[in-house]
Amino acid sequence: MGQTRIQARTATKHIFVSGGVASSLGKGLTASSLGQLLTARGLRVTMQKLDPYLNVDPGTMNPFQHGEVFVTEDGAETDLDVGHYERFLDRDLSRDANVTTGQIYSSVIAKERRGEYLGDTVQVIPHITDEIKNRILAMRGPDLQGQTPDVVITEIGGTVGDIESQPFLEAARQIRHDVGRDNVFFLHVSLVPYLAPSGELKTKPTQHSVAALRNIGIQPDALILRCDREVPQALKSKIALMCDVEVDACISTPDAPSIYDIPKVLHREGLDAYVVRRLGLPFRDVDWTVWGDLLDRVHSPREEVEVALVGKYVDLPDAYLSVTEALRAGGFASRAKVNIRWVASDECETAAGAAAALRDVDAILIPGGFGIRGIEGKVGAIHFARTRGIPLLGLCLGLQCVVIEAARSIGLTDANSTEFEPDTQHPVISTMADQKQAVAGEADLGGTMRLGAYPAVLEKGSVVARAYGSEQVSERHRHRYEVNNAYRDKIATSGLKFSGTSPDGLLVEFVELPAEVHPFFVATQAHPELKSRPTRPHPLFAALIAAALKYKLAERLPVDIPDDELASAEQGA
């Protein structure tokens, strides 16, 4: 029908993770945790998310609806679950790790226009399902590191029964037929609710969910039973009988104290051993050396700090998921627990508001974002951190706001970004040359930003160079605006150093205040949170938390504040 179907048997194994009864049961974390366990058994694992929405990618979605956009090394805007995959597997994934209905239909329609289907009537089956299968099977090829995986774990978004998910489930069913039943494992995540009035756990929702899955031709090999408490053995036996799975394959997964405990929960229930046995994979013991040390740092901190996250989307923490996980990982590096104070940036627009929201925190983080709302509050928070000597880290938009605040501090009172004020007299932040058409509405917004990993050169002896332990770094980006080079010399008179640039020196990547002026005041145009791992904290986040610990233990005295500025701030407070 215009495409070649895969019929040959393969050494690579496929695990499909589906969900039933309700959304937000933790399919992504379950898949990530299983991937971590198989990796700890010495297997090469890669992961993929199938999203049933019609958007080509989440890049243009409202963060309040979808959460953060996770950017891969090769510049794809992907689902936040891909971030979980990278953190749990401790490896970089490519753009192939996220497939959407929008991508599938766009590809099929483009092929039809080119005449690749040789006059066929293009239909959901086989053309859409074949395209999905090709995307799934492509994960068996060499990854970004040039290695071929032993196992591909594919999470199917949505809930069984959703119209949008049907082509993806059908494609998964066909893959079991194409590559051999011994090479595919179906894992279904379902809810077992507890009814307080009767004091009972109810199995009917899971039974109906599995029945819906079987109705489309998929018999699950194992069930993840999500509940707020342990599912007793008697109920496991009942579910096993009614859903036609082995009792050992009914995995009780009560809520865990930390997401990093989930691999231990699954291992205790024997899921990884069951998967290895069913797929005929080599059996090796789990090496808990690295993950065990992580759990020790998670549950046995020696210190505690509070970090204010001053953002626009704080009503939905998932909008900053990688940032919060990177902060916590930075704490793990110092064996410290990081408590996050969510501060809506609007609260910090005045000196009094900033003081009320931030006066007793140990560090401040200014994350990325888009649009004018809340910008003056971010600038106000930066001013408070600079004048009070509070450790600060700015990310992407955070760097731009740091530059705006520095410019205003030296008399450019109306300094701004052309994103917020196109006709500003002092555009210290301007549109990148290759982004002007998109900003003007003359080109697509989706997928057109400066995306993916780019190198930077750091100034020798700078705060950031010492944090990284290197003068050559690479970070992921997602932005359309940059520091206006025409203002660099002028802004430098404020004391702000441009300590990292692109290799050609044209794009500002890092700014900072020297260590002798401020304990830690750093911002980057990049998104370093995307490369942080719980077992390998990112250097900038580790440095921020280390500075926060020192700040907490030291006397909190203002640092190098002019008398008139100090008096003004105190009057405002």
From Swiss-Prot:
A GO biological process held by the record: pyrimidine nucleobase biosynthetic process
Record InterPro entries: Class_I_gatase-like (IPR029062), CTP_synthase (IPR004468), CTP_synthase_N (IPR017456), GATASE (IPR017926), GATase1_CTP_Synthase (IPR033828), P-loop_NTPase (IPR027417)
Active site: C396 (nucleophile), H527, E529
Region span, Amidoligase domain: 1-281
UniProtKB keywords: ATP-binding, Glutamine amidotransferase, Ligase, Magnesium, Metal-binding, Nucleotide-binding, Pyrimidine biosynthesis
Residues involved in CTP binding: S23, D162, I163, E164, K202, T203, K204, P205, T206, Q207, K238
Catalytic activity, as annotated: UTP + L-glutamine + ATP + H2O = CTP + L-glutamate + ADP + phosphate + 2 H(+); L-glutamine + H2O = L-glutamate + NH4(+); UTP + NH4(+) + ATP = CTP + ADP + phosphate + 2 H(+)
Statement: the UniProt record of this protein carries the keyword Nucleotide-binding: yes
Chain residues that bind L-glutamine: G369, L397, G398, L399, Q400, E419, R480
Binding residues annotated for ATP, in chain numbering: S24, L25, G26, K27, G28, L29, D81
The keyword Metal-binding is assigned to this record: yes
Regulation (activators, inhibitors): Allosterically activated by GTP, when glutamine is the substrate; GTP has no effect on the reaction when ammonia is the substrate. The allosteric effector GTP functions by stabilizing the protein conformation that binds the tetrahedral intermediate(s) formed during glutamine hydrolysis. Inhibited by the product CTP, via allosteric rather than competitive inhibition.
Binding of UTP, residues: S23, K202, T203, K204, P205, T206, Q207, K238
GO CC terms in record: cytosol
Domain (Glutamine amidotransferase type-1) ranges: 306-554
One Pfam family cited in the UniProt record for this chain: CTP_synth_N
Pathway: Pyrimidine metabolism; CTP biosynthesis via de novo pathway; CTP from UDP: step 2/2
Binding annotation for Mg(2+): D81, E155
MF annotations from Gene Ontology: ATP binding; CTP synthase activity; glutaminase activity; identical protein binding; metal ion binding
Oligomeric form and interacting partners: Homotetramer.
Function in brief: Catalyzes the ATP-dependent amination of UTP to CTP with either L-glutamine or ammonia as the source of nitrogen. Regulates intracellular CTP levels through interactions with the four ribonucleotide triphosphates.
Protein family: Belongs to the CTP synthase family.
Misc. comment: CTPSs have evolved a hybrid strategy for distinguishing between UTP and CTP. The overlapping regions of the product feedback inhibitory and substrate sites recognize a common feature in both compounds, the triphosphate moiety. To differentiate isosteric substrate and product pyrimidine rings, an additional pocket far from the expected kinase/ligase catalytic site, specifically recognizes the cytosine and ribose portions of the product inhibitor.
Name of the protein in question: CTP synthase
Natural source organism: Nocardia farcinica (strain IFM 10152)
